[in-house]
């Protein structure tokens, strides 16, 4: 199995990806945006869940784009475009993305503008991962204003570690998963 090429901040943890993608509700043939794609690890898992997924991996950081491209190649991810720039601009009316069915947002810079653009594109479901409380509050407020707020899930993961010949658990940083759904 291939190893993920990492960047600062590392890839999203597998447990967080699993819950995030479950909340996203990907379907075969969806157009999927991975905003703040980092290593592309979320897109790689999304491609395993939904067949014929069209992926738009977006990040403003050069190191993230290079890591994502390397990881996509290593994991055989096709039907993916790696896009450099600010998500709010790339998702805007002048951008190169026509429509999005589902979006994962791991990069929360300009979260209000990103959410607005995704709603304009009639995105069915949006999942935002955040570790900072202020980001969670801004995201919830923006989603409520846009009429798409569904729920927040707080996840704390602990991993086993050896201690004195026995086992203890070491906690990882908790993550908030904020879910937005298009209202019928």
From Swiss-Prot:
<dbReference type="Pfam" id="PF13847">
    <property type="entry name" value="Methyltransf_31"/>
</dbReference>
<comment type="pathway">
    <text>Cofactor biosynthesis; adenosylcobalamin biosynthesis; cob(II)yrinate a,c-diamide from sirohydrochlorin (anaerobic route): step 8/10.</text>
</comment>
<feature type="binding site">
    <location>
        <position position="87"/>
    </location>
    <ligand>
        <name>S-adenosyl-L-methionine</name>
    </ligand>
</feature>
<dbReference type="InterPro" id="IPR025714">
    <property type="entry name" value="Methyltranfer_dom"/>
</dbReference>
<feature type="binding site">
    <location>
        <position position="12"/>
    </location>
    <ligand>
        <name>S-adenosyl-L-methionine</name>
    </ligand>
</feature>
<keyword id="KW-0949">S-adenosyl-L-methionine</keyword>
<keyword id="KW-0489">Methyltransferase</keyword>
<dbReference type="GO" id="GO:0019251">
    <property type="term" value="P:anaerobic cobalamin biosynthetic process"/>
</dbReference>
<comment type="similarity">
    <text>Belongs to the methyltransferase superfamily. Archaeal-type CbiT family.</text>
</comment>
<keyword id="KW-0169">Cobalamin biosynthesis</keyword>
<dbReference type="GO" id="GO:0043776">
    <property type="term" value="F:cobalt-precorrin-6B C5-methyltransferase activity"/>
</dbReference>
<dbReference type="GO" id="GO:0008276">
    <property type="term" value="F:protein methyltransferase activity"/>
</dbReference>
<dbReference type="InterPro" id="IPR023475">
    <property type="entry name" value="CbiT"/>
</dbReference>
<feature type="binding site">
    <location>
        <begin position="36"/>
        <end position="40"/>
    </location>
    <ligand>
        <name>S-adenosyl-L-methionine</name>
    </ligand>
</feature>
<feature type="binding site">
    <location>
        <position position="59"/>
    </location>
    <ligand>
        <name>S-adenosyl-L-methionine</name>
    </ligand>
</feature>
<dbReference type="InterPro" id="IPR029063">
    <property type="entry name" value="SAM-dependent_MTases_sf"/>
</dbReference>
<dbReference type="InterPro" id="IPR050714">
    <property type="entry name" value="Cobalamin_biosynth_MTase"/>
</dbReference>
<dbReference type="InterPro" id="IPR014008">
    <property type="entry name" value="Cbl_synth_MTase_CbiT"/>
</dbReference>
<dbReference type="GO" id="GO:0032259">
    <property type="term" value="P:methylation"/>
</dbReference>
<keyword id="KW-0808">Transferase</keyword>
<protein>
    <recommendedName>
        <fullName>Probable cobalt-precorrin-6B C(15)-methyltransferase (decarboxylating)</fullName>
        <ecNumber>2.1.1.196</ecNumber>
    </recommendedName>
</protein>
């Amino acid at each position: 199995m291939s190893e993920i090429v990492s960047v600062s901040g590392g890839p999203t943890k597998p447990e967080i990806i699993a819950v995030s993608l479950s909340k996203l509700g990907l379907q075969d043939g969806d157009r999927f945006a991975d905003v703040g794609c980092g290593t592309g690890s979320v897109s790689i898992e999304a491609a395993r869940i939904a067949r014929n997924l069209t992926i738009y991996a977006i990040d403003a950081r050069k190191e993230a784009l290079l890591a994502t491209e390397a990881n996509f190649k290593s994991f055989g991810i096709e039907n993916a475009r790696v896009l450099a720039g600010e998500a709010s601009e790339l998702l805007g009316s002048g951008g190169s993305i026509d429509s999005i069915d589902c979006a994962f947002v791991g990069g929360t810079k300009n979260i209000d503008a990103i959410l607005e653009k995704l709603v304009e594109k009639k995105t069915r479901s949006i999942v935002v991962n955040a570790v900072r409380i202020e980001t969670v509050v801004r995201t919830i407020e923006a989603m409520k204003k846009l009429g798409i707020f569904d729920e927040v899930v707080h996840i704390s993961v602990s991993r086993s570690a050896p201690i004195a010949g026995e086992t203890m658990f070491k906690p990882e940083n908790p993550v908030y998963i904020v879910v937005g759904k298009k209202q019928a």
